[in-house]
Amino acid sequence: MGLPELLFMSQLVAPDEVPRWIPGQLTLDSVPVGWDQVTLKGYQYTSLDVEIPSMRDYMLVRYKCDDAVMSRRAGGAWRSERVGRGVCSLLTRGESSQWKWDRPIDVTHIYLAHTELCRVAEEVFERSVSDVGMEDCVRAQDDILPGLMSAFESELESGGLGGGLYRSSLVNQLCVHLLRR
């Protein structure tokens, strides 16, 4: 990795730094159990209007609350969607944006490492992949993603025999699913 890439990476926000920009009550955290390539965090938030800096990882949000209006902009007009239980939002890495919502929300965040998504993309496309783009989406129309995110959450809360292998399988499923989108 060259100097420009190292400087860019040093300016990106890691999952543990998110509360500096989006203050909320932490309800779940995979960091103490040492998950690799993916971090799961749960939060309860009041209604907020926040600037989200450039993230190091891809960020997926699953809503576990009653309906709220979620709005996003990145240098342009606001885009608003109704979100609620079972709905997901997608945020790419390396781009800042502004988000706001009109009422308290309960969410699960999954942060997926760029290196992991690129690794899986290399296997899928059978060639070297240095970057994968993902378009921000306030309301992802996706029947699979909420279930995958729920499986990660269940694994964190309950665990069990073969936990590392199971989690690795979930990471692979998540990466392939995102690449198909």
Model-identified regions with their sequence ranges:
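Amphipathic alpha-helical segments enriched in hydrophobic/aromatic residues interleaved with Lys/Arg
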Residues: 127-173, 177-181
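N-terminal regulatory/effector-sensing and dimerization cores
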Residues: 20, 26-130, 159-160, 164
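OB/S1-fold single-stranded nucleic-acid-binding modules
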Residues: 2-22
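Hydrophobic alpha-helical transmembrane segments
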Residues: 2-4, 28, 174
